[in-house]
Amino acid sequence: MEPSTLYFYVNGRRVTEKNVDPETMLLPYLGRNLRLTGTKYGCGGGGCGACTVMVSRYDRGTGQIRHYPACACLTPLCSLHGAAVTTVEGVGSTRTRLHPVQERIAKSHGTQCGFCTPGMVMSLYALLRSHPQPSEEQLLEALAGNLCRCTGYRPILDAGKTFCKTSGCCQSKENGVCCLDQGVNGVQEAEGEQTSQELCSEEEFVPLDPTQELIFPPELMILAQKQPQKSRVFTGDRVTWISPVTLKDLLEAKAKNPRAPVVMGNTSVGPEMKFKGVFHPVIISPDGIEELSVIKQGNEGLTLGAGLSLAQVQDVLADVVQQLPEEKTQTLCALLKQLRTLAGSQIRNMASLGGHIMSRHLDSDLNPVLAAASCTLHVPSQEGDRQIPLDEHFLSRSPSADLRPQEVLLSVTIPYSRKWEFVSAFRQAQRKRSARAIVNVGMRVFFGAGDGVISELCILYGGVGPAIVCATDACRKLVGRHWTEEMLDEACRLVLGEVAIPGAAPGGRVEFRRTLLVSFLFRFYLQVSQSLSRMDPGRYPSLVGKYESALEDLCLGHHQRTFELQSADAKQLPQDPIGRPIMHLSGIKHTTGEAIYCDDMPLVDRELSLAFVTSSRAHAAILSMDLSEALSLPGVVDIVTAEHLGDANSFAKETLLATDKVLCVGHLVCAVIADSEVQAKRAAEKVKIVYQDLEPLILTIEEAIQHDSFFETERKLESGDVAEAFRTAEQVLEGSIHMGGQEHFYMETQSMLAVPKGEDQEIDLYVSTQFPTYIQEIVASTLKLPVNKVMCHVRRVGGAFGGKVGKTAILAAITAFAALKHCRAVRCILERGEDMLITGGRHPYLGKYKVGFRNNGQVVALDMEHYSNAGSTLDESLMVVEMGLLKMENAYKFPNLRCRGHACKTNLPSNTALRGFGFPQSGLITEACIVEVAARCGLSPEEVREVNMYRGTEQTHYGQEIHTQRLAQCWSECKAKATFSLRRAAVDRFNAGSPWKKRGLAMVPLKFPVGLGSVAMGQAAALVHVYLDGSVLLTHGGIEMGQGVHTKMIQVVSRELKMPMANVHLRGTSTETVPNANVSGGSVVADLNGLAVKDACQTLLKRLEPIISKNPKGTWKEWAQAAFDQSISLSAIGYFRGYDADMDWEKGKGHPFEYFVYGAACSEVEIDCLTGNHKNIRTDIVMDVGRSINPALDLGQVEGAFIQGMGLYTSEELKYGPQGALYTRGPDQYKIPAVCDVPAELHVFFLPPSKNSNTLYSSKGLGESGVFLGCSVLFAIWDAVSAARRERGLPGTLALSCPLTPEKIRMACEDRFTKMIPRDTPGSYVPWDVVV
């Protein structure tokens, strides 16, 4: 068959392609073929939103143009025939005009690293094309599928809200009060307290003008109106794509290719082919078949075409619900409820109703409801039409109930509900939106005579087995029973007996899932009872009071953000930018997609791609490695092994590639080099390795302790007389807390490009790294070259957080080796799953403590032991342990303290630095100890915190003097700003009247030491050139990874040289211009490099002083020309030797830190005791920032770090299998905070400026400190859990573990449902996952 031609538009320009490979997705095509690099690769599975574009299509049936967001990483190029694609470049640019969305996100300070920003822009843009004045709920829905690791989302939401309708009301009357009227817990604030400083002027924003948008191409409209004559066929190397254009063609194609999947949005088949190794040689993708888009309201039900997207289904259901009487819409409302939280907007607009039904995923949110409602599927074939029930047999793929191979799903009919029929749907996930359900359920009951006697009952659960499960026997036995609590108890017993979840069930969380089975049943019972009461109050009593709080899920509510920052000094010159909220200087480029990251760089001539082969075993000997099949594949050039590297394979105590054994799943074994990325990855899958498992296999901290498996010797600090203090203590307790690890989840994965220069063995490296010098050194060592022949360049990094240092150097060294060996450029971009598997993250911690204290809560003795899971190599683990010990006391003076730390050697990928560097773990252990002391003393944790807090001038446990007046000020200000006492009383009142939902309030202090522990690690350099036109080029050793260091450095130059910031340019960081620079991290990047930049500027000014003094009113252009004429150098090197710092671990004493950042945070939450869900109601943060160089950037660091910390402590859960494999390898399984997790109210306050003569303009580094404040949310949750436990007569204290996920919250709120579930005997099964 002759290949078809593909026509579509991109940014208003026609694209014509022949011979399209069906395996080509839109994302790589945009970057490689069209050089549109603004659309980013973040995960490859539609889970992060970085690749969002807008797709526009003309609907021949309605005559309307539909604009919707889509994930380019999952959009097959073949599917775009007749569509118009808009990328971020097509929305606006610096060369043409900025779109209001781009302008407002940038000027609202909504970008940091900028890698997620194009996706954010496109999600908002697509929303505005359909809803020019959206509601706040529509805004939240539009951004639910976009992840950001830097900003904390608040400034992005602020930008989006400028387009919203003036009323931001939640449109509901939760507890009978509108969200705009109720304050928090009924505590109203004074009018003045609700105002906020402006960081940008909304009046200056360009108004949105829908008439100025790109029009839909008339050519495509004409093309769509013409009835196509025949199916389109595209044939690639491995896959054939058939696009039938009529139902007849579709049925014919399916008859000829009965095993071929029918693909509409590619959101199910696409990930299966990419991540699960499923292969389909033929794919059928209908295009524009009207019968697949039918919407028909009949007398008995609603018929929806299988080709409708889930977003279209959502819109249709919302319209129909408004038209029909309530009694007919039970099923429709249940489906709507599930659709609101199902995936992100991009996926809902791509995925089809038919695809969702036919995929029959075990955790499908719609199928349990559709099956419970007895829906019917219409399935034609060439042999005729059939109707089959969508029931449990269909969902379990029973051959007698399934579609025949030649049939297609055409439509589904959803029956209207009847009077006295009730349908409900529930789901529980790790995150409120855009997260797969852990358990979901569809439930329907029918009381035929309206007498409360069950005539029909249907309950289907998802997420509890290999397929959706129907509790058939339980439902049958309950028919004829009255709807009473006795019936409920019997129903719970029957369901638990029928729906069995084995202890070793895939997915884990077994007891939680069992509890949800009956918790959801209880909620269904209550909702039906309440409906019965409304319909016939005489017969059915109201549930108001006892059970009212259990009826509904948590409501997210209205969002508000305020901040009180610092203003610039009134005495400084107007043009002096220091202290002013200057926008991130790459902000506009972030929003237009013009900011270039490593993988955006153009292809180099004859460039190669590299893909790694990693170990599938955690501890094993390599018996053999067969490369023959991989080497025989087309395009494969070479495979690099440890043997090729020789003695260069080893550096420090690590190896680049495995030699004779592997130490973890994800250990690098070899690297495949091929002409393209696709060829390299396919070849990597063909490398055959034979292993022999070795003993012992050590994964957990407990196993490491058992096998005495540790790196180095322990680290120890001690002050006072601990033994004597314990003897005199009035009370003593012992406890422990386990804290899980955390994935960096920088939005840009590990990326590098090695380019041999062609002579003298020179090589240039373009790497996404925090430490170019280290990359340079390791690569030079591997290539056996002097360092001066290896140059590392970094323009910007798409997020790092400590994760782009050690492992990045290993990846870069192997990439550079391949490049130099073949004298060709080599590019290596890790996929998200590879990145998460290989690179490690934050160390899991086990903290054990013994504490002696007085009855007033004052701690007199503390003996603490830290165990960190370091993984298979040492990496940064020793320094993490050290920093954890040095910072462990947080804000408290413990007079007698002993603390020890151990780095456990295990068979996991090496863990490494992550924002906070040990303090988020060690600080949490201390706070958990404080909470337990408070419970033992019958005091609030806040009272115990105050009793033990540093006061005035003190000495730390390592002997450094500390002045803590600002700490006390932060604490008292936070208490006042948060109206803590009033809200504490309000929370208690709420809890007294709400048995099933509880609120919690917690406040934690912060003392974060800043410094790197040695002088040498703190040195920095800068280079400043003044050109003859008066412009300045600045280079320094710091890396721009989102924190705005380049912006701050240009502010420094502007102040020192008294010139506009626009006159100063900074191209990036390079070992060629500033050699031997230290790592960018530890909150000191701006501090150290800023002092070097300041030194360079002052050197220049001193050199030019005679010239300037002769012409004081001259311009820089005139001064530069005069200096040149007098042979005076216009270049200056600035240098800062580093802060004075030392630490003697033998003596346990020293002065490792230059200064301390102080702060406090108060958070309020509400939990759902039935499901474990929680919502973040409000957070107040007070920070001591010294004198802020840029309040807007500093606010972004505080908020972003807080949200990242909140994720660490509540939702981000790494899951490992019992053989050491990481399960959580992408946003589908690993849940960082999303827009829905941001506190409804977030208030940030900076203390007035303070002076510190040693730092840059008295500023303080804020990159890491805010992470720890996220634990205020954890302790607020625990406060709520404790309230629930006290009410149930349970001990208020229970061993804390972190993260405090919905599973842990629910299981801690013990009740009759947790007690009725079956329990497995430990040791009788192998659990699906292990706690490492």
Curated annotation (Swiss-Prot):
Mo-molybdopterin binds at Q112, C150, A800, F801, M1041, G1082, S1083, V1084, V1085, Q1197, L1262. Its cofactor is [2Fe-2S] cluster; FAD; Mo-molybdopterin. FAD binds at V262, V263, M264, G265, N266, T267, S268, V269, A343, S352, H356, D365, L409. It is an enzyme of class 1 (oxidoreductase). InterPro entries: 2Fe-2S-bd, 2Fe-2S-bd_dom_sf, 2Fe-2S_ferredoxin-like_sf, 2Fe-2S_ferredoxin-type, 2Fe2S_fd_BS, Ald_Oxase/Xan_DH_a/b, Ald_Oxase/Xan_DH_a/b_sf, Ald_Oxase/xanthine_DH-like. Keywords: 2Fe-2S, Cytoplasm, FAD, Flavoprotein, Iron, Iron-sulfur, Lipid metabolism, Metal-binding, Molybdenum, Oxidoreductase. Expressed in liver. Binds 2 [2Fe-2S] clusters per subunit. Binds 1 FAD per subunit. Homodimer. This is Aldehyde oxidase 1. It comes from Cavia porcellus. The gene is AOX1.
